[in-house]
Amino acid sequence: MWQAISRLLSEQLGEGEIELRNELPGGEVHAAWHLRYAGHDFFVKCDERELLPGFTAEADQLELLSRSKTVTVPKVWAVGADRDYSFLVMDYLPPRPLDAHSAFILGQQIARLHQWSDQPQFGLDFDNALSTTPQPNTWQRRWSTFFAEQRIGWQLELAAEKGIAFGNIDAIVEHIQQRLASHQPQPSLLHGDLWSGNCALGPDGPYIFDPACYWGDRECDLAMLPLHTEQPPQIYDGYQSVSPLPADFLERQPVYQLYTLLNRARLFGGQHLVIAQQSLDRLLAA
C-alpha cells in the first residue's frame, strides 16, 4: 500500500520518500496514519480493498464541498488501492477544538455553503454513508417524500433487518411525510453529519471533514447542534448572522434529529435505543 501511495504522490510532488509513518489513535472505522512524504504531511485512511468505493465517495464529497469555496476541507491527494488495501490520502491538519471565535466563523461558512448553487431536487448523484451506515440519495423533487422514505424509512428498515422494531414502518413514514408536507425548502448542499467530531480548528481556521453530503433542507445540518452539548453554540450564532432560520424551524428540528438518533440506536444499541424510541413516540403523539 505504501508503495502505491508513494507512486501517486510522486506524480504530484516529484520523487521523494516516506520520512514519517505514525498510526493514529481513535481509528474506530478505518485505520488512520500520519504520513510525511517529501516534506509534506498527509492524513491516510486505509482499510480492506473492498471498501475502495467508500473512500472514492468520500473524496468526491470533499471535492464537492471544496468547489463551493465556502468551507475549508482537507485537500484530497490520492484515492486508490493495491492488491490488499484501499486508501484515501488527504492533507494532515492537526485538529484542535473549536473556540468561540472559530465556531462563529464556521457557522457563517456553513450558511454560505447552504446558499451555494441552485439545485432543483433533493439527493445526490451517488449514494454514500452516514458513519458506517449506507445512505441512499436517489433524486426526489418533494422534500417530504425524500426525507420520510430515504432517511426515516430507510433507517427503520435497516433496524428491522437487525431485529429492532420501532413500530409500523409504513405508518411512521406516512406520519413523517405528513409532518413535512407543507414544507418545501430550497435544496441546500449539506455536510450531512455536522457534529463536534467532524469539525475542528486547523492552522488557517475552522474546517470540516467526514461528510455525508446530499442536497436537502439546510435545517438538517443545524438540527445536529443541540444533540452535542460540546459543540460551541457560536456556530448557530454565526449561521444566523448570515442566513437567519425561519421562525418555525424548531417545529421540524425533532423530525430531523430522529434520523441521527435512529442511526445511533442501530449502531450502538443500549441507551441509544431508548432515546430514539422516546423521540419517535413524542413525534407520533404530536
Curated annotation (Swiss-Prot):
Record carries keyword Oxidoreductase: no
Stored Pfam families: Fructosamin_kin
Alphabetized InterPro entries for the sequence: Fructo-/Ketosamine-3-kinase, Kinase-like_dom_sf
Binding site for ATP: D91, Y92, L93
Active-site annotation: D193 (proton acceptor)
Keyword line: ATP-binding, Kinase, Nucleotide-binding, Transferase
GO MF, one example: kinase activity
EC number from the UniProt entry: 2.7.1.-
EC supergroup of this enzyme: transferase
Top-rank taxon, per record: Bacteria
Keyword Electron transport carried by entry: no
PANTHER family linked: FRUCTOSAMINE 3 KINASE-RELATED PROTEIN (PTHR12149), PROTEIN-RIBULOSAMINE 3-KINASE (PTHR12149:SF8)
Family as reported in the entry's similarity comment: Belongs to the fructosamine kinase family.
Record's function text: Ketoamine kinase that phosphorylates ketoamines on the third carbon of the sugar moiety to generate ketoamine 3-phosphate. Its precise substrate are unknown: does not have ribulosamine and/or erythrulosamine 3-kinase activity in vitro.
Name this protein carries in UniProt: Probable ketoamine kinase YniA
Gene this chain is encoded by: yniA
